[in-house]
From Swiss-Prot:
It comes from the Bacteria. Its main location: cytoplasm. Its EC number is 1.2.1.38. It comes from Picosynechococcus sp. (strain ATCC 27264 / PCC 7002 / PR-6). GO terms for cellular component: cytoplasm. Catalyzes the NADPH-dependent reduction of N-acetyl-5-glutamyl phosphate to yield N-acetyl-L-glutamate 5-semialdehyde. The active site is at residue 155. One of its GO terms (molecular function) is NAD binding. Belongs to the NAGSA dehydrogenase family. Type 1 subfamily. NCBIfam families: argC (TIGR01850). This is N-acetyl-gamma-glutamyl-phosphate reductase. Keywords: Amino-acid biosynthesis, Arginine biosynthesis, Cytoplasm, NADP, Oxidoreductase.
Amino acid sequence: MSSSEKVSVGIVGASGYGGMQLVRLLSDHPQVELTYLGGNSSAGKPYAELYPHVGHRIKMIVEPIDLDVIASRCQVVFLGLPNGLACDLAPQLIERGCKVLDLSADYRFKDLDTYQAWYKTERTDQDTNAIAVYGLPELYRDDIRRAQLVGCPGCYVTASLLALAPLFKQGLIQPETAIIDAKSGTSGGGRQGKINLLLAEADASLGAYGVASHRHTPEIEQICSKLASQDIRVQFTPHLIPMPRGILATVYATLRDPGLVRDDLLTIYSAFYRAAPCVEVLPNGVYPQTKWACGTNLCYLGIEVDHRTGRVIVMSAIDNLLKGQSGQAVQCMNIMLGWEETAGLPQLAFYP
């Protein structure tokens, strides 16, 4: 597609934090025209009523979800709906000729039995699921380029996989030893009122949740298994921390070769991500902070080796709402349409 063409884009599920980030990114994208905002409970409301701070730029009304209307106005559609809803809409939008990017979990799994077991949702869209491409550009850029439907990864998954991918792909670790300790800001829980996300509950507190049962676990394992060409199980524990946005995932694993040093791994990671404009491999002894990634589509990776234990430690920092969600979806759209991969994506953080 010509870089001079403006492509018409719509967002279904524009009222949540992910939808809001899409509105922000797409309204500033040089090659996009935002032509539709859709929702259920928010239908009929001016978007500025939901987010008053964008009223000077966004004059659109949130409309009911009507597939014929969407297809008539939009060449590309982002689905920012709760799990279990995109699988009803995506097949119909694809039939109508739209390119679709789904931010939910519906099209992340090639094995629908795994999805149904973890998300408790029956699926009848096997043919559509078969054409879905996993939306992690650093691993599947060529597939995304040819895709009609992209299932965008989860936020924890993105941070974890970018830390783990070189280790599994290059066979650098004992595969059964991978442990992921991840921490996320409260925006990962969405915009709906939840007791654990109240300021009085979350502030000045830190706690684990979804221990040994978080839904992102099988998603991480699916991709790690492909990279390692064997069945992989990981230990993944997420934590909620009292800040609005950001994820720090710290990965631990036992090295196959205890003689590897930090410089070796930095060389391997730098080579692995040499064509990845949204991944920054940090130099010797520099470890990432979530604030560095805030408001950007970047992932910062820091690497260390503990020779006492024979383990590699990889730290991965992202903005959960951007590289972990909406920014990565826009990155995938850019690739699908043959544009510069970073078009419309901020490269410098909100700082401090």
